[in-house]
UniProtKB/Swiss-Prot annotation:
Reaction it catalyzes: a quinone + NADH + 5 H(+)(in) = a quinol + NAD(+) + 4 H(+)(out)
Protein name stated in the entry: NADH-quinone oxidoreductase subunit N
Membrane spanning residue stretches: 16-36, 43-63, 79-99, 107-127, 132-152, 166-186, 208-228, 249-269, 279-299, 304-324, 331-351, 381-401, 414-434, 460-480
HAMAP family documented for this protein: NDH1_NuoN_1
Nucleotidyltransferase keyword on record: no
Gene designation: nuoN
Family: Belongs to the complex I subunit 2 family.
Membrane-protein topology: Multi-pass membrane protein
Single Gene Ontology MF annotation: quinone binding
The entry's keywords: Cell inner membrane, Cell membrane, Membrane, NAD, Quinone, Translocase, Transmembrane, Transmembrane helix, Transport, Ubiquinone
Function, as annotated: NDH-1 shuttles electrons from NADH, via FMN and iron-sulfur (Fe-S) centers, to quinones in the respiratory chain. The immediate electron acceptor for the enzyme in this species is believed to be ubiquinone. Couples the redox reaction to proton translocation (for every two electrons transferred, four hydrogen ions are translocated across the cytoplasmic membrane), and thus conserves the redox energy in a proton gradient.
Listed GO biological process terms: ATP synthesis coupled electron transport
Assigned EC number: 7.1.1.-
Pfam families: Proton_antipo_M
Length: 496
């Protein structure tokens, strides 16, 4: 006869799943409202989504220090809190953009908002666990919702993008499960902190099994955060989806992937397994450099920003590879500042979107579209120029501070060559960012009567989000120290 197991409710510490429960409840409320009423506006669903995201953020910031719960599947620590903070801030900035011109019909469906909230919960589960099963559940929940959100744009290119993303996601899921299985065989556990103890005790033997498991899991993570050579899907998928969702994808799925990578790679880096550090060093250099070179030859601004985002992911991987408290703090500082810059840049692409393409019919956002933008829409050109200068790492704009602190952490840890490579690539990237600025300010407008091309979708919510993003980018010099202190406090909670 099976023995009855008595588990006190207090020991489950169910408060650890409260943030995810909030947005899941929000998604179910939206679906329930749609079931009983068919005439609710997207303004109503947008407002509901923002309310639940804000409640979720409040639940996240309620935690301090370190806690586990839900049969030890859940882990709330400093990096979990910081990453959820980034996810929710980005989501709160994204969802009001649904209040745009009526032709973006996907925002009229309540299912869009429900899927978006389910996706947020998936990302939160990913970053709030060190158990490979729950990480996988979160990964697939978020991915399946995101595939659908991309396809709901209802253009041929959006369907193609969703299929490409789904195919790569399915491959990554296969790699993740196979790698997890091999590491389970080697260690007897799927909990990363216990796995680390067991592997260290066994001196990472059997080595071939550990190596194979590492390679498969590293490949899965590489697909999700667009590391070279697993990045090839990224430009096509970003090009096919709508611009602001592409901007969101360049930030939120990647921070979730970075946290998983940080927890997993720390098993090997903390034990000073040299071949792992060398492999990550090589991937870092490759991911920073190759997309930069590819971005130089792009004819479409959106594809250029896609390759740019891959290169920025390489900077984040450098922080993970260095694996110090300073580098981990630099990663979060970098990504918070990158969030506002990149989301602002992609939103500007949407503002200048038009059904009529007078320039290059192969692309939606060729450089020629922005010719003479300073004469047609001077404020828009200045804002886009600020976002480009920030992405290039030009002081005193936001991303400069992230790059500077990250390079400082590399120098302090003895990675002098890596710091030089980051500096050189920042200089290279300035070419394609400045290229867009030259088109906007120094080229003649190709169509003198095309004022309606620009600010086509510039509703008040879009103007507000762009203005807020630009304000953070410009004024970051005044609050970056306090932001860094805030980040450092939570990183130290985690022991990184």
């Amino acid at each position: 006869m099976l023995e009855v197991v008595n588990i006190p409710l207090e020991s489950l510490n169910l408060s650890t799943i409260l943030p995810m429960a909030v947005v899941i409840a929000g998604a179910l409320v939206i679906l329930g409202i749609d079931l009983f009423t068919k005439n609710s506006s997207r303004s109503f669903y947008t407002m509901l989504s923002v309310i639940f995201i804000v409640l979720d953020l409040g639940a996240v910031l309620y935690f301090e220090g370190y806690s586990r719960g839900f049969f030890d599947f859940m882990l709330i620590d400093g990096i979990s809190i910081l990453s959820q903070f980034i996810i929710l801030i980005a989501s709160a900035l994204f969802i009001p953009l649904a209040l745009t011109s009526k032709r973006f019909h996907e925002f009229s469906y309540p299912e869009y908002y429900a899927l978006f909230l389910f996706m947020i919960a998936g990302f939160q589960f990913m970053v709030s666990s060190d158990h490979l099963i729950l990480i996988f559940v979160g990964l697939e929940t978020a991915s399946l919702a995101l595939y659908t959100l991309i396809a709901m744009h209802n253009r041929q290119s959006a369907f193609e993008a969703a299929i490409k993303y789904f195919t790569m996601g399915a491959l990554a899921a296969g790699f993740f499960t196979f790698g997890s299985m091999l590491l389970y065989v080697a260690s007897g556990t799927l909990e990363l902190n216990v796995m680390a103890e067991v592997l260290v005790e066994r001196d990472f033997q059997p080595s071939w099994l550990v190596f194979a498991g590492f390679v498969f899991l590293c490949s899965a993570i590489g697909f999700k955060i667009s590391l070279v050579p697993f990045h090839t899907w990224t430009p096509d998928v970003y090009e096919g989806t709508n611009s602001v969702l592409a901007g969101y994808m360049s930030v939120v799925p990647k921070i979730a992937g970075f946290i998983v990578a940080m927890r997993f790679f720390d098993i090997f880096l903390a034990s000073e397994i040299e071949w792992v550090r060398n492999l990550l060093y090589f991937l870092t250099i490759l991911t920073i450099t190759l997309p930069n070179i590819m971005a130089l030859v792009q004819e479409d601004v959106k594809r250029m920003l896609a390759y740019s985002s891959i290169s920025h992911a390489g900077f984040a991987l450098a922080a993970i590879m260095i694996n110090t408290t300073q580098s981990t703090s630099a990663l979060f500082l970098y990504w918070i500042l990158f969030l506002f810059t990149n989301l602002g840049a992609f939103t500007m692409l949407w503002v200048s979107r038009s059904k009529i393409n007078h320039w290059n019919h192969r692309y939606d956002h060729p450089y020629e579209r922005f010719s003479g933008m300073a004469r047609i829409m001077p404020v828009g050109a200045i804002l886009m120029g600020i976002f480009m200068l920030s992405l290039a790492g030009v002081p005193p704009f936001a991303v400069f501070w992230g790059k500077m602190y990250l390079m400082s952490s590399a120098l302090n840890s003895g990675f002098i060559v890596l710091a030089l490579i980051m500096a050189v690539n920042s200089a290279i990237s300035a070419y394609y960012y400045l290229k867009l600025i030259i088109y906007m300010f120094l080229k003649e407008p190709q169509k003198s009567n095309e004022r309606d091309v620009f600010m086509k979708n510039a509703t008040m919510p879009l103007r507000t989000i762009i203005g807020l993003s630009a304000s953070v980018v410009i004024l970051s010099v005044f609050f970056v120290d306090r932001l860094l202190d805030f980040i450092l406090k939570y990183v130290e909670y985690s022991g990184f």
